[in-house]
């Protein structure tokens, strides 16, 4: 069973698979060098980036992330404001300080980072890091960034962790999850909480989710109050702050029954604009889709009742359980299954989390999740200029409203649904595998080739 902690990770924008994962890989590589006693002998490092990681890597800051990882940084604690100056120094001097300054090595601007368009066999997002001592290659490793900030090296690809802790309710499908809920009389969040308590202490769980919600709120707040143009060739203007001013200033809007939709849009836009700017965000389950889970919880906070720790913990546990089902049985990588694995999964998770808070039965929670995904099936990932901006930012807003609608439809339904959550997860994965690679985060088709940068 995947811990819910793994579904919500504090990190850095703009991409979990192309920024967070590669930074973790770089850090893991230098940690290995230290552990093996090789670090002080290293004189040069080089990186090869493959497949989708290469094709959209520049727009997703993959190169910057790997360099920051090799320098000894982690996505959740890296000083975001210090990154540009550090990268400028590396580019200017062709030298890189590894492992928090322990050793300085050659990292030439022309071939320190090589972008290769071919795929490696195991996954669309692959990278190899090499370390030399003089002319001798002393260490080399292949990493795959499999979505949501998860990384795995070649030896462990597709293998279960051997030291997995036994949990009381080890569900691998929605049917099993519902079976345990029936057996115990527990809600989805209650049942998942019992699993988490086998992995972490109660205090750790409370502290972890307090930090997740606090990071999400801070991100919404920054996004709502920051103006200007997002980085990159598209020159996309931020929209959340102007929308906030409009909503706060206009009396006329307060009589509009659709007013709440504007607020939900604003929450989601705020988060995804921060992500696009390389800010501090929470993967939920990825960065490309990181606005949906917080926007729906912010909606609950503003329009239903103030969110307390008990409320946000229930929400994250239910949403995270659904995310874990997609992670175990399909994919949360846009490079593997298109945007249905990112925005589709986030919509499904948020719908389930909201249904849980609104008092849904375990069946209704799964129906909400199913509706949230069913109407994102076939969604392509075709980011313009390889950046997490168009169509990604606006798409998070649309999917946040869709998640709220999905949970309402699930709870108002009186007939039996024809499509189960397990079937829709299976369908999403097969649809993604059938999808032309042009539509799986390669920026070689769709909007990516129709929309011109100025």
Whereabouts are the PLM-identified features?
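Accessory "access/gating" subregions that flank catalytic or transport cores
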Residues: 203-338, 446-454
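Accessory carbohydrate-recognition regions in carbohydrate-active enzymes
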Residues: 12-55, 122, 152
């Amino acid at each position: 069973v995947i811990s819910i902690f793994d579904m919500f990770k504090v990190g850095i924008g703009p991409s979990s698979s192309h920024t967070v994962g590669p930074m973790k890989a770089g850090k893991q590589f230098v940690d290995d060098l230290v552990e093996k006693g090789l670090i002080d002998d290293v004189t040069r490092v080089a990186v090869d980036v493959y497949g989708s990681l290469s094709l959209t890597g520049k727009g997703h800051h993959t190169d910057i992330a790997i360099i920051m990882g090799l320098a000894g940084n982690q996505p959740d604690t890296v000083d975001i404001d210090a990154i540009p100056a550090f990268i400028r120094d590396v580019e200017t001097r062709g030298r890189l300080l590894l492992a928090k300054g322990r050793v300085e090595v050659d990292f030439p601007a022309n071939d320190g980072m090589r972008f290769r368009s071919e795929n490696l066999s195991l996954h669309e997002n692959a990278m190899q890091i090499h370390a030399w001592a003089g002319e001798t290659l002393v260490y080399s490793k292949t990493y795959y960034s499999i979505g949501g900030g998860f990384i795995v090296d070649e030896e462990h690809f597709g293998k279960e962790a051997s030291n997995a802790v036994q949990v009381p309710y080890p569900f691998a499908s929605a049917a099993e999850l519902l079976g345990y809920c029936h057996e115990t009389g527990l809600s989805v969040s209650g049942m998942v909480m019992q699993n988490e308590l086998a992995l972490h202490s109660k205090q750790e769980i409370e502290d972890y989710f307090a930090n997740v919600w606090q990071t999400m709120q801070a991100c919404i707040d920054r996004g709502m109050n920051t103006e200007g143009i997002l980085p990159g060739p598209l020159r996309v203007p931020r929209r959340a702050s102007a929308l906030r001013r409009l909503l706060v200033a206009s009396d006329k809007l307060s009589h509009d029954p659709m007013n709440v939709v504007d607020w939900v849009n604003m929450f989601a836009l705020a988060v995804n604009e921060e992500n696009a700017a390389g800010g501090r965000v929470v993967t939920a389950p990825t960065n490309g889709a990181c606005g949906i889970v917080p926007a729906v919880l912010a909606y609950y906070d503003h329009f239903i009742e103030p969110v307390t720790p008990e409320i946000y913990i229930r929400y994250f546990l239910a949403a995270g359980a659904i995310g874990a089902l997609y992670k175990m049985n399909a994919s949360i990588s846009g490079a593997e299954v298109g945007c249905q694995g990112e925005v589709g999964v986030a919509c499904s998770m948020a719908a389930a989390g909201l249904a849980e808070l609104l008092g849904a039965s375990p069946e209704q929670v799964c129906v909400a999740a199913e509706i949230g995904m069913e109407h994102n099936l076939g969604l392509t990932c075709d980011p313009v200029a390889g950046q997490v901006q168009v169509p990604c930012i606006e798409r998070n807003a649309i999917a946040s409203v869709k998640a709220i609608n999905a949970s309402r439809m699930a709870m108002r339904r009186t007939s039996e649904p024809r499509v189960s959550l397990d079937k829709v997860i299976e369908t999403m994965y097969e649809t993604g595998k059938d999808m032309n690679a042009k539509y799986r985060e390669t920026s070689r088709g769709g909007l990516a080739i129709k929309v011109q940068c100025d």
